[in-house]
């Protein structure tokens, strides 16, 4: 093999290595992002941090090549419902790239109160479109009660999403049937109920109304729909 051919191969190899590194850092921008809808109690229990805050500004993040595509949102924390004690006053939430990485871009009005759930990584709060992020004004009174005090009591329970025929397999489960087409997408369980352990039933998890209805009216049903 001639020296020139060796040099050309070395250049090609170097280019491919650099390209692979770049793609690794930037990620696959063609990858579609999809998130399954979750009951707000599931969103609460699976999150590292839950807070009520106002979005103040959106900025691009400074940093190395892998970080430049991230953004951070400046927020004003109003109330921390769940999270580390040292994060009582979160000022920034970070989000991954918008294209294909489930990044969250706040397109709503600024200085409006939002309920925000997220993860804590390396002392940094991160959010995505898969997190429960919703205007506080759109959250029902029952959901507000849930985020404030009740959902935390049911984190030992498991809410099972029911898209078709389904049934529970243990006493710590509640069937979430809002996603069935027959329910006409009213999302009643989402908006008004919490899955909580009941002392009088030896810790068995059942649906409980967080609204004005009688608490025993919406107990868990052992459905086989």
Feature map (PLM): residue ranges:
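Transition segments tied to proteolytic processing and entry into folded domains
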Residues: 2-225
């Amino acid at each position: 093999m001639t020296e020139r051919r060796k040099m050309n191969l070395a250049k090609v190899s170097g280019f491919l290595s650099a390209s692979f590194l770049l793609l690794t850092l930037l990620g696959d921008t063609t990858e579609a992002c999809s998130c399954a809808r979750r009951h707000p109690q599931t969103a609460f229990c699976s999150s590292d941090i839950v807070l009520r805050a106002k979005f103040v500004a959106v900025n691009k993040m400074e940093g190395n090549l892998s970080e430049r595509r991230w953004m951070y949102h400046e927020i004003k924390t109003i109330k921390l419902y769940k999270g580390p004690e040292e994060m009582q006053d979160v000022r920034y939430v970070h989000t991954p790239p918008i294209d294909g990485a489930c990044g969250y871009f706040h397109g709503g009005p600024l200085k409006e109160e939002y309920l925000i759930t997220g993860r804590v990584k390396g002392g940094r709060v991160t959010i995505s479109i898969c997190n429960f992020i919703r205007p506080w004004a759109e959250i029902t009174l029952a959901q507000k009660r849930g985020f404030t005090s009740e959902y935390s009591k049911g984190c030992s329970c498991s809410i099972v999403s029911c898209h078709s025929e389904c049934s529970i397999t243990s006493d710590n489960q509640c069937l979430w049937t809002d996603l069935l087409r027959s329910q006409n997408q009213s999302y009643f369980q989402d908006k008004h109920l919490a899955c909580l352990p009941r002392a009088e039933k030896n810790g068995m998890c059942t649906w409980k109304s967080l609204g004005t209805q009688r608490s025993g009216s919406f107990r868990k049903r052992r459905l086989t729909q």
